[in-house]
């Protein structure tokens, strides 16, 4: 074996170093002692990992072409690492509790392991490596969902997550086997050269799409998503809703545009149906929720529909719009979950929407930051969420102009998505109304968030404002996608 090819895997290599240092630091230190240094150490290691890999690299490959990387993949890995860093920072307050402090090292190692699996997944150029990366991410994620295993809801959420992941993996591997039977190869490039529309390949594509649809929580593959989000620790729910979803969506986009390019008319119709169902049904269910974590679960399903809307364009603009949307979604959604986690810690574990009544009077800063994040998720200008939705719509419209036979369908889907944007604004404003207008006989007391929570909120808020105003962020992603 030529070991020099490992030099082409710098992001994965640096993550392995971070994982090993975290393991030895946890192993060699006493868990009974006050380890205030542990969280800063892991966060600094993640910052070093991001700095080393922030600049897009040239297209390289390893292991006979099974592993490939390039500027666009490098940018996405940086975004995923940024999201993981924010989760680690905000997790400090939660991991300081007596019932979780002794598991702090395990949490960091599990979350780094999931990120390592996602990196392998997005760099895969072979269905086998893709599946291995996916499982590398899914197994530690199941452990994270059931991290509070002695809480009934967390154990139930973990069981449901494992069952869903197992079923989706089985569906996906069956689709891959059909594609192998039809094409005789598992390399993405080779499959793209020989694949053509036939009952076998169409069935394989549908099964593969369905398997990843479960990972992204698209309708109708969203079963138990809300239950898993509600039962998992809030910090894990935030990670699950953005980082893993972003990696799976990018991978599905790349495979559809690269491997299934000759079958574009088939998967485009499939996407249209799934996008409309995901955005519409999730919005309608979100309005009915009183539990804020279930509320954000249906919000994330709707956001997944918007993310996949970019794929309809089937061009470099699609990759740019999707990656930019994931970046904005990471900072906005994690800002919301950071506030939910902080309020939960100071309100006896309550995450009901009624507990936010009058939050502005007792904790005005948190209410203001929550409003900024919700406005960004809803696409209200001048926040970054508005620009991300604009670029997604623009990518979809460009796809309508390219694919004339399905152009009318694309315009119809974009129109439905625009209408649903108004609907999503309504249910996001329900939380704003609760914080600023509604009164409570037993309001949440005034409290000071931990320094780590303040830092996480600062990073997210700067991202919400700056990523929309600073055009070089979009240009950075666009240059990488077109390289």
Spell out what each predicted region is.
Residues 1-483:
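Alpha-helical transmembrane segments of multi-pass membrane proteins predominantly involved
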């Amino acid at each position: 074996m030529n070991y020099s090819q490992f030099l082409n895997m710098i992001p994965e290599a640096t993550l392995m170093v971070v994982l090993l240092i975290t393991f030895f630091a946890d192993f060699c230190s006493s868990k009974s002692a006050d380890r205030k240094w542990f969280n800063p150490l892991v966060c600094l290691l993640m910052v070093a990992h991001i700095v080393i890999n922030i600049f897009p690299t040239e297209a390289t490959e390893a292991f006979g072409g099974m592993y490939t990387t390039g500027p666009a993949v490098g940018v996405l890995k940086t975004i995923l690492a940024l999201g993981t860093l924010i989760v680690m920072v905000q997790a400090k307050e939660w991991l300081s509790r007596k019932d979780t402090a002794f598991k702090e090292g395990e949490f960091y190692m599990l979350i780094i392991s999931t990120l390592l699996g996602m990196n392998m997944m997005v760099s895969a150029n072979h269905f086998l490596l893709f599946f291995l990366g996916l499982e590398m991410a899914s197994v530690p994620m199941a452990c994270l969902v059931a991290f509070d295993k002695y809480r009934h809801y967390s154990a139930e959420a973990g069981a449901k997550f494992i069952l869903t992941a197992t079923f989706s993996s089985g569906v996906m591997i069956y689709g891959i086997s059909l594609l192998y039977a039809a094409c005789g190869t598992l390399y993405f490039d080779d499959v793209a050269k020989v694949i053509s529309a036939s009952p076998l390949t169409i069935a394989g594509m549908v099964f593969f799409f369905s398997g990843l649809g479960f990972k992204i929580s698209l309708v109708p593959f969203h079963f138990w998503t809300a239950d898993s989000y509600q039962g998992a620790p809030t910090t894990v729910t935030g990670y699950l809703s953005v980082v893993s979803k972003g990696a799976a969506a990018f991978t599905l986009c790349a495979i559809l545009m690269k491997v299934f390019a000759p079958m574009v008319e088939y998967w485009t119709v499939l996407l249209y149906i799934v996008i409309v169902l995901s955005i519409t049904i999730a919005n309608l269910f979100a309005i009915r929720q009183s539990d804020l974590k279930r509320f954000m679960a249906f919000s994330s399903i709707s956001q997944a529909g918007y993310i996949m809307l970019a794929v309809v364009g089937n061009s470099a603009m699609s990759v740019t719009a999707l990656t930019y949307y994931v970046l904005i979604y990471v900072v906005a959604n994690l800002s919301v979950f950071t506030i939910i986690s902080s309020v939960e810690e100071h309100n006896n574990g309550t995450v009901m929407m009624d507990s936010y009544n009058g939050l502005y009077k007792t904790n005005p800063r948190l209410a203001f930051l929550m409003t900024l994040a919700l406005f960004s998720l809803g696409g209200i200008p001048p926040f970054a969420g508005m620009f991300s939705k604009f670029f997604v719509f623009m990518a979809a419209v460009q796809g309508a102009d390219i694919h004339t036979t399905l152009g009318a369908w694309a315009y119809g889907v974009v129109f439905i998505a625009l209408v649903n944007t108004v609907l999503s604004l309504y249910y996001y404003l329900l939380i704003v109304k609760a914080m600023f207008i509604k009164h409570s006989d037993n309001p949440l007391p005034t409290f000071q968030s931990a320094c780590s929570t303040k830092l996480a909120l600062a990073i997210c808020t700067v991202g919400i404002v700056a990523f929309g105003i600073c055009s070089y962020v979009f240009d950075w992603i666009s240059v990488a996608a077109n390289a």
